Amino acid sequence: MRKLLPVPLLVLAVLPGQPATNASDEFARTIRPVLAQNCSGCHNSVNPKGPVDFLKAQTAADIERQRGVWRNVAAQLRNRTMPPVASQLTEQDRLMVATWVDRHLQQTACSGQDFAGSVTIRRLNRRDYGNTIRDLLGVDLDVTALFPEDGSGGEGFDTDGETLFVPPLLTEKYMEAAQQVLNRVIVTPPLAKSFSGADLLKSSQQLKNGVAQGERAEVGPGDELTAPFSVYADAGYTIGLTLERSLESAVPVQVKVDGIDRGTNSSPRYTEKGATGQSRNVMLTRGPHVLSIVAPKTPLGVISVAIAQKAQPPSAEKLALHYRLFGMKPGETPLAPRKAAQQLLAGFLRKAYRRPVEQGEIEPFLKLYDRSAERGDPYEERVKLALSGVLVSPKFLFRVERANPAPGIHPLRDHEIATRLSYFLWSTMPDEELSRLADEGKLQDTKVLAAQVNRMLDDPRSRVFADTFIGQWLGTKDLGGRVVPTLIDLQDFYTPEVAADLREEPVLLFHYMLSENRPLLDLLNADYTFLTDRLVKFYQLQDKVTGVGSEFQLVHWPDDRRGGVFGLGAVLAMTSHYKQSSPVLRGAWVLENVLGETVPPPPPDVPALELAAKGHADLTIRQTLEMHRANATCATCHRMIDPIGFGLENFDWMGRWRDTEKGKPVDASGTMPSGESFNGPVELREVMLKRKDEFLRNVTQKVLGYALGRSLQDGDQCTVQKIMQTLEKDHYGARTLIREVVLSVPFRESQTLPSAAPVDSKVPARRLPKDDTP
């Protein structure tokens, strides 16, 4: 029989300072034989029943190349969720392998070389776009009505660059959005345009004979006069005709716009020599049009045609937005219009591109201005055309970081750091202070960066980070969509307003933790929350919580039934089926979202849960699952998932407390694969707190992935480990986590891999001189 090293002695074998070959020798001599003997029956390349081929790992270096997989292996062994109960693996071997893998991954994660990784160039997601437009032009744009929903990727967020590509439809939407925004900001004086008879004659060569310039245009039967014109707004317009008939009889006159008949006067009355005005009211869309006049029977003289926009006076808000952009009132034209437009564009581009711009970057938009000027557009319309070009420019729509071609790790430029920071915490462009610090080159200073993190988290705009991060991480942002809050049997306690409150509750909890630097462990066991009077009723606390109005208030739970995210109605409702709680969904949610474990999908041939309960309508969900687990195919995974869900069975499918289910007392007891037993949500939370390291690693990875906008790689584990060490020293503060993410190497620097290097390879952390090119 093999003689195994006691676990403490085995750990000493891989302490820092020991040669790397010791780890490889120990793996080959001690660890691999245990895996081959106890695990290779399922985990092999010939007939695999699991995602890992243990026999493939020949050396310790092979483990380093699959850190995520082996970290999960160690967790499964540590928590006794693997191997199956029937395995012959001894407790000593199980602990030895788990400890060795954990230590080896930890020792090799930080090998003295930094890892920054690289970020895919990505467009602004629709939230970022809307907020940036708001801060750039002062307009709140309903992006949900314009743009399709962004997908999620990476660590599970819509900030991931791999999902933020630009489908063709989105290009059209950007152009539409630019027009909408600028029409709401820029006030163009109402159109008032007139055409003389001579102007109209230019469109009909045959009518020019015998007609003097500036005199009336005589239109004979069948003749048609046309005049092109443009309007600058979707609006109503009046087309006025000043006509003179040539004979005594009445003359019907047909007016067309874009070939469409806009009305005929069947018997107009004109004085023989004087002129009388007739008008048509039409609705026109912004853009070019063609006016046509036809007198099909009798010659008449056209003295002039006038087109006037029927415009309401602009609102005070629109006038203010216009003045903010132009620095002058609508209708006022600067003495040197082109120079003024150039100055306006330079300032606007700097904000839109989130960095200083060069003259060459302004020129293309000045050409748009010139094109508009050549066709006679007013000053406001010329600027509008130029700005619309900016708003569909890739340098506005994408977060561009200029790559350094030399292999290695390179500091980001100050304006790139400012942009990363502002979109991380505010989902918008940098404000004046961040931009000023970037101009001064001060964002390379970690003390300055840390101060900016505090300033930005104290700003109300940080609510958008709390809302987005929590809603997407916990999966609560869709509450109210899946369970429609208009069902008659729910209206007493569940309405659209209650659904909105339930979505907001975890956001306020997390935002409060950020504001007060509360421990991250509050997410597991906080004895406080934020409630409205509607939620007091929803949670059935009317007799225990008083004085709460329609606005959210910080409230301490009156008992310990609820605590942290485990007691939030939004979480509990989103992890249930319709009118049926689900220990499976809830257990899997805790494992994946809270502890960061990978829960495998059910096998394709697994029988549906409903089949186990067929013919047994009086069974509780627990009894149904017990019948389901009788199938060996289902037992392994459910042994890991179900106990956690059972601990939450006192909460019904909407997250309200219950003591009975189908007339039977709720059984909320469970036993984890590790052997820990609990009964009810209070004891379940205590079990979860014992696994705080797994939780803290998971939330650190989630925040880092959200901030970077990419999937984490093996090389990022050193950063994660360093952040966790700092968290431990600072009582696991939520604000501390944000600060350490911002100060981390991957956030402040970027990595250029050698052309032949694999994505996860480590590149020498050579620092190059900072490139200050804007």
Predicted segment positions?
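Extended surface/linker regions that mediate inter-domain or inter-protein docking
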Residues: 100, 120, 128, 132, ...
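Sec-dependent signal peptide recognition
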Residues: 2-9
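A short tyrosine-centered beta-strand micro-motif
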Residues: 237, 289-291
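Sequence context surrounding c-type heme c attachment/ligation sites in exported
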Residues: 17-72, 79-91, 536, 551-690, ...
